[in-house]
Amino acid sequence: VSTYGSLLKTRGVGRIITAQLVARFPGGMLSLAFLMHVERIHESYGAAGLVLAATSIGQAVAGPLTSRWMGVWGMRPVLILTSAVCTVAVVAVALGDASTSVPVFMALGLLAGLANPPVQPAVRTIYPKMVNSKQLTPLFSLDASAQEIIWVLGPVIATFLAIQVDTSAGILVAAAFLVGGGAWFISSPELGRVRIPRSKRRFGVVLGRPPVLLSTIVGFLLIAACSAIEAGVVAVYGHGGPEAGFVLAIFAVGSLIGGLALGHIPISPWAMARRMTIILVGTALAAVWMQFAWLSVFLFLAGVGIAPALAVLFAVVSSSVRFSDTAEAYGWVGTGQLIGAALGSAAAGFVIDAQGAQGAFVVAAALLAAGAAIAAAFHRHSPDLRGRDAGPMPDTEPVAIVT
């Protein structure tokens, strides 16, 4: 606790964490909000899954590219442009009704994905410039816990609004977060103080670094599993009561507690696999016992591993690339997670249509098993950060010597 207390006393840390959290909050709401909105209109989880797939394609194309643009044109211009376009597309989805065809919803989802603001790569690049080397790993842990508010509490809010108001309400609230949170983050002084150097490497080269690729793949599988779990919980209880929101809130609490409790533990090469295994065990048990009480207990257990696993991913990437490549590297990792959020919901939707709600938990367990196995098989590509600085490697270049 004292570690996090001193960290939050560091100038600007609390403000930038909160601002980026609000700006990124739509990422946790929109997948499930789109799923419920399109499913209600067209009465098909499959149709909703197609819209989410289109959104994920847009995110896949744009994520690393817009992150790299920040090193060329600066963070603020890129964030302003993408936030504006994304907001327009998201509001258009919310205004869609029975006369709006699935292909039109898909086109709007694609545009929203293409314009997804690169807030995560921006803030991950700023962090090492705000704190000393000893504070960086706890900062990643604190940030990972905050991110779980996005991924887990976001769907709770989307579900509550869909039940109490209308499925479009969750989408419109997400648009409000896009505007308000985006403006707050963009106005942060740190965005003016930190300049991302232009990378000297070709686009995509950083993804070829084994630690970055490993973190991208495992992050994709982890968030896909979380989205499948969320869709499964909604399918179990439907839109007619508060139970789904309660279960997802318990899932969120588990993640927050896990992130804060385990965030100080040094990161070893096996840390990623171990933390993925915690989530796998909880999810597998939830797939067997789906009564309200047992589902809550087992998803709490699964949640305990989520934020710690994400903290490992962030630290592995930060310690494995040069500063000029950090934005693009985090762009790839963030894209993997966003695609996972969309495709996890989409896959779960198709399975729910075919086999019922339990199928979504089976899908999630399979994704987590794959993630844990990959993390274990390639643990040598996860650096040993016990007693080591988790900050990025400095950029170096030849220096002219006057003789």
Where are these regions (language model features)?
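Intracellular juxtamembrane helix-capping segments at the cytosolic ends
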Residues: F34, P117-V131, P308-V321
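A late C-terminal transmembrane helix in Major Facilitator Superfamily
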Residues: D325-A357
